[in-house]
């Protein structure tokens, strides 16, 4: 996901990390997050220029490039750290994201209900350097074919 958002026009900053764990005072490690006991989700922090890119466009890209219908799973990766989540920093972002998910479910945009967690951001910690550059080529190819108009 980090590799995708780095290519989006209007995105200013992207970094991989961990969001919304149970112990928000202690920075988690990848090994700790993988135990499934920290409550943290693997996440990508995205800072964007709203005058160049609408939040709904970011949401469209997010939902088109992962499976938001399987709880605590992405592909072969299983565990609460792999949950689909949107963690917002403002009440407006929260309302937009909640409305977007509700509309996806109302429109039956996916073969199963969207189970993406939408919540205020309570904590974000950057991932260790070795975990920040993983790229999944098929995901990037899907993005470039569907969202060429949004690319830098």
Report each predicted region and the residues it spans.
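Flexible coil/turn and secondary-structure edge motifs
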Residues: 1-152
